[in-house]
């Protein structure tokens, strides 16, 4: 018989699993200056790779965790990922070179891919329809608060223990979540429902997936949207510190922006049925082209002081806010023609877009020169390309329907 905790405990457990990702990214941001000074003092921009290497590993892991959980069950994959995450965190705590730290962070990301995919599958195993949507809305409500808190938590830990202490916090966090999962939740995907992995079927599904123009274009749009986010996240701490001299208050500003940005998902839920997914994506990307273009122009012409910081703050909010009105919608568009292979499609689409987004974001972040200009230029270009792609998709769909 399945053992399922009560609703409040179930939601809290899932939220903690999801929060592993936000904690692993956002709590690291205050540590980047110390990591740069300790491990790469001659090229401090390379400390950004501590963020993007984790996301890259998570993207790769997303390819495998969904299918593996269908074959072996949800709990073994989640707990195996947690074991990898904890082991990698310990290695990271003892890393003496940036290269070893980046390798450990990549392995951390691989382990963290489990909560990203498998926790959602657990909800789907136990609930469906409106009840599933209700459970996930509560989970995401809790989850969206974590990016607001994580930098402050990270800053406190780093002040007390130094940057290596943050990895021991990751070990503790994941250990608590894993023990909670083991003790309180039974396997939700019983053996009789599992499917053996067949390479031939997998290849055929991939060929079908990437043979759909709407899927390929949607992945391109999503990758560029992710690139904007990853570029901002990997560079934002340096901009607060070096460009504006606000390193100490960074966690508070970042938390405030994250709280306001979370309302993007709420607004999307209210508007998407009336205005449509394609319109909202096009509108938000158009706004981002204008915002990034104005930011680029004003910083290039030497805007400084409080007005410059206020402009950056508004622009940062726009980059985070647009995620709530674009990513879910572009995912839904990509999934429209491949509902019969939804599980595989979700994993492959998410993984491909994440990995591509990281590969685009890394050079953008490494160009940081002490000002927001390189970041604004990169996001301006990414927004234009994403806007062109979604417009191409809309026109192609209109032509096919005619």
Q: PLM features: residue spans?
A:
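Juxtamembrane intracellular "pre-TM" segments in multi-pass secondary transporters
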Residues: 1-3, 188-218
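Paired small-residue
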Residues: 84-91, 99-107, 310-315
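Helix-loop-helix hairpin linking two adjacent transmembrane segments in secondary transporters
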Residues: 100, 134-183
């Amino acid at each position: 018989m399945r053992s399922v905790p009560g609703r409040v405990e179930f939601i809290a457990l899932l939220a903690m699993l999801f929060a592993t990702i936000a904690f692993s990214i956002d709590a690291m941001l205050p540590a980047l200056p110390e990591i740069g000074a300790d491990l790469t003092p001659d090229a401090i921009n390379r400390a950004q790779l501590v963020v993007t290497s984790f996301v890259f590993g998570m993207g790769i892991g997303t390819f495998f965790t969904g299918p593996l959980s269908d074959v072996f069950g949800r709990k073994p994959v989640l707990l195996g990922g947690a074991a990898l995450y904890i082991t990698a965190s310990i290695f990271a705590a003892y890393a003496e070179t940036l290269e070893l730290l980046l390798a450990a962070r990549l392995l951390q990301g691989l382990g963290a891919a489990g909560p990203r995919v498998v926790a959602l599958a657990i909800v789907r195993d136990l609930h469906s329809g409106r009840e599933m949507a209700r459970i996930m809305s509560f989970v995401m409500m809790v989850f969206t608060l974590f990016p607001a808190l994580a930098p402050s938590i990270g800053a406190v830990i780093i002040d007390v223990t130094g940057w290596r202490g943050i990895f021991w916090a990751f070990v503790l966090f994941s250990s608590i979540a894993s023990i909670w999962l083991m003790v309180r939740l039974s396997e939700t995907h019983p053996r009789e429902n599992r499917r053996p992995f067949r390479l031939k079927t997998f290849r055929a599904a991939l060929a079908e997936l990437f043979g759909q123009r709407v899927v390929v274009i949607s992945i391109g749009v999503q990758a560029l949207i992710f690139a904007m986010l990853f570029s901002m996240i990997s560079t934002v701490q340096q901009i607060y510190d070096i460009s504006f001299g606000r390193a100490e208050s960074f966690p508070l500003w970042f938390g405030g922006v994250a709280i306001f940005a979370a309302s993007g998902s709420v607004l999307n839920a209210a508007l998407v049925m009336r205005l449509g997914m394609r319109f909202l994506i096009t509108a938000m990307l158009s706004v981002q082209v204008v915002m990034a273009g104005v930011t680029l122009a004003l910083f290039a012409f030497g805007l400084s002081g409080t007005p410059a910081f206020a402009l950056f703050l508004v622009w940062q909010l726009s980059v985070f806010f647009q995620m709530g009105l674009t990513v879910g919608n572009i995912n839904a568009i990509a999934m429209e023609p491949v509902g019969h292979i939804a599980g595989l499609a979700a994993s492959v689409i998410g993984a491909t877009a994440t990995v591509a987004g990281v590969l685009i974001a890394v050079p953008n972040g490494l160009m940081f020169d002490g000002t927001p200009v390189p970041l604004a230029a990169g996001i301006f270009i990414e927004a234009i390309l994403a806007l062109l792609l979604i417009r191409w998709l809309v026109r192609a769909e209109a032509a096919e329907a005619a």
